[in-house]
Swiss-Prot record:
InterPro entries in alphabetical order: Dihydro-acid_dehy_C, DihydroxyA_deHydtase, DiOHA_6PGluconate_deHydtase_CS, ILV_EDD_C, ILV_EDD_N, IlvD/EDD_N
Residues reported in the UniProt entry to bind [2Fe-2S] cluster: C122, C198
The reaction(s) this protein catalyses: (2R)-2,3-dihydroxy-3-methylbutanoate = 3-methyl-2-oxobutanoate + H2O; (2R,3R)-2,3-dihydroxy-3-methylpentanoate = (S)-3-methyl-2-oxopentanoate + H2O
Entries under HAMAP family matching the protein: IlvD
Protein name as it appears in the record: Dihydroxy-acid dehydratase 1
Cofactor section: [2Fe-2S] cluster; Mg(2+)
Enzyme category, top tier: lyase
Active site: S520 (proton acceptor)
Residues modified as N6-carboxylysine: K124
NCBIfam families: ilvD, PRK12448.1
């Protein structure tokens, strides 16, 4: 029978000093036999996805204590990728994932907490906490702050919605010289109306959806908007549930509730199956690979490639379409609705466990609105956006008049009526990416699935932006942005500005972009990232020259630099001859801090999740 970890610091005469300090935090005599549960919050006023979380830690804590536990809250950092985008701040985004994972480990192990509730939301916070949960392997429940409502422009005549908006629309309009200042400002003011994670199937929402599929979050975690009153129930339930999980593990020796027991290889494959089916952000590939490594699960790019070849695209939301946002996915039945369709297509392992319903199959039976779910589920998925700008959680209780149960032409489709039988994400291989690269096929126009173009080479994101806005990129070009990988950046910047500017220049369907960096979940078009190995690690992307021909073939999962092997060997030899300057950008002016240098020293390429290679450290 496992012992409560917290007894290390709460029991025995030699722990008198620790108990004295615990008492100074408010603990009473009767609390020392209870489980101590960490409430891992990520509130910050810097990030709209987290600005409303200040009081939610206390809400969870009150439920923990009502259920017989002791709650102790702490905060992690949280970087807003949108605000950090397009300047040196983006260098810090991906490395912050490792800091979050480490800081959670530090706090939980230093204070011998027995379990956790992780209150996350945005891009690197959910993955960082997920990595920590796998590392610590103590009972955990994830509950996110929830998605932002989509922005809306209404008719001045009848008030009806004439367009839905998000952050990406604001960026594209602002960069389009044909758009007036007045129109650009209207979109800017309307694009992000409420608290919550950005309203499309971007990285934050993708990851919060995937925690449902892995089995560590409650139904609706990824889709019910942050402002809705019914989301409060997820936080209350999380507080009660984590105490139950604690007792099952520590008092009943039930290890099935532990993260590593739930997040098995089959669970990671289920999550990736969902990811491909819903056209999730390409960043999710990095984060699932990283979390799997922390869990000790052998889940690799080859598994992702295998899954992507057999799973159809069953759901589309912005940026893959301007018709649907996450709030519309919720109305169609949320993640359990998509999982239900995948289950009926025999594409899931329904025996995988979770924190709330026994098995995935049981969860689908209870929550899939097209699979016979009861009245509670039918009501829950009617939760709608309120349409009132606010930074306050649970501030409205609007409901949809009807559910979207149309599996032929609706937001969520069945396999027979899939958006495409090819999934929403694909892994490409070739001499430009021997270890693979990722494309979000759900966001690529089918006319571009096979594409050949001329290389326009840039050694940094900043140079690429300047080149695109300066009309140095033309229809038929393949924009190459290199030395932006985990080690070469360092930090593997997102390329939302270059992809948005290609659209604003009218090149969204006539150009491609290939990089060893990564993309915001808001990027769409023929944009291919995560080239592995990256340029700084000797990847072939570092040998591409201006005007080279690049061949892209999504159906055959191929990307190829049309240069002979002899020429490539000569280029590689010339690069190696540069000595210490080999595999580094030429004439790039970028200040790299000591903190980023420390990350770069251990960073791996994207095919390993851009995690740190700790095997380099000597014991």
């Amino acid at each position: 029978m496992p012992h409560y970890r917290s007894r290390t610091s709460t029991h025995g005469r030699n722990m008198a000093g620790a108990r004295a300090l615990w008492r100074a935090t408010g603990m009473k005599d009767g609390d020392f036999g209870k489980p101590i549960i960490a409430v891992v919050n990520s509130f910050t006023q810097f990030v709209p996805g987290h600005v409303h979380l200040r009081d939610l830690g206390a809400l969870v804590a009150s439920e923990i204590e009502a259920a017989g536990g002791v709650a102790k809250e702490f905060n992690t950092i949280a970087v807003d990728d949108g605000i950090a985008m397009g300047h040196g701040g983006m260098l810090y985004s991906l490395p912050s994932r490792e800091l979050i994972a480490d800081s959670v480990e530090y706090m939980v192990n230093a204070h011998c907490a027995d379990a956790m509730v992780c209150i996350s939301n945005c891009d690197k916070i959910t993955p960082g906490m997920l990595m920590a949960a796998m590392r610590l392997n103590i009972p955990v429940v994830f509950v996110s702050g929830g998605p932002m409502e989509a922005g809306k422009i209404t008719s001045p005549v009848d008030g009806k919605v004439i367009a839905k908006l998000d952050l990406v629309d604001a960026m594209i309009k602002a960069a389009d010289p044909n758009v007036s200042d007045a129109e650009a400002e209207e979109v800017e003011r309307s694009a992000c109306p409420t608290c919550g994670s950005c309203s499309g199937m971007f990285t934050a929402n993708s990851m919060n959806c995937l925690t449902e599929a892995i089995g560590l979050a409650l139904p609706g975690n990824g889709t019910i908007v942050a402002t809705h009153a019914w989301r409060k129930g997820l936080f209350e339930q999380a507080g009660r549930l984590v105490v139950e999980l604690c007792r099952r593990y520590y008092e009943q020796d039930d290890a099935s509730v532990l993260p590593r027991s739930i997040a098995t290889k089959s669970a990671f494959e289920n999550a990736m199956t969902l990811d491909v089916a819903m056209g999730g952000s390409t960043n999710t590939v990095l984060h699932l690979l990283a979390a799997a490594q922390e869990a000790g699960v052998d889940f690799t790019m080859s598994d992702i490639d295998r899954i992507s070849r057999r799973v159809p695209c069953l759901c589309k939301a912005a940026p893959a379409t301007d018709k649907y946002h996450i709030e519309d996915v919720h109305r169609a039945g949320g993640i359990l609705g998509i999982l239900g369709e995948l289950g009926r297509a025999d594409l899931l392992d329904l025996s995988c466990g979770n924190v709330h319903s026994g098995t995935l199959g049981e969860a689908i039976n209870q929550w899939d609105i097209n699979g016979g779910a009861g009245e509670a589920a039918q009501k829950f998925f009617r939760a709608a956006p309120g349409g009132i700008p606010t930074t306050v959680a649970f501030s409205q209780d609007a409901t949809f008049l009807t559910l979207d149960m149309d599996r032929q032409t609706g937001c969520i489709r069945d396999k027979a009526h899939a958006y495409s039988q090819d999934g929403g994400l694909a892994v490409l291989y070739g001499n430009l990416a021997e270890k693979g690269c990722i494309v979000k096929t759900a966001g690529v126009d089918e006319s571009q699935w096979v594409f050949t173009g001329r290389a326009r080479v840039f050694e940094s994101q900043e140079d690429a932006v300047e080149g695109i806005l300066g009309d140095r990129v033309q229809a038929g070009d393949v924009v190459i942005i290199r030395y932006e990988g985990p080690k070469g950046g360092p930090g593997m910047q997102e390329m939302l500005y270059p992809t948005s500017y290609l659209k604003s220049k009218g090149l969204g369907k006539t150009c491609a972009l290939f990089t060893d960096g990564r993309f915001s979940g808001g990027s769409s078009g023929l944009v291919i990232g995560h080239a592995s190995p990256e340029a700084a690690e000797g990847g072939t992307i570092g040998l591409v020259e201006e005007g080279d021909t690049i061949e892209i073939d999504i159906p055959n999962r191929r990307i190829h630099l049309a240069v002979g092997d002899t020429v490539l060997a000569e280029r590689r030899a010339a690069m190696q001859a540069r000595g210490e300057q080999a595999w580094q950008p030429v004439d790039r002016e970028r200040v790299v801090s000591q903190a980023l240098r420390a990350y770069a020293a251990l960073a791996t390429s994207a095919d390993r999740g851009a995690v740190r290679d700790l095997s380099q450290l000597k014991r």
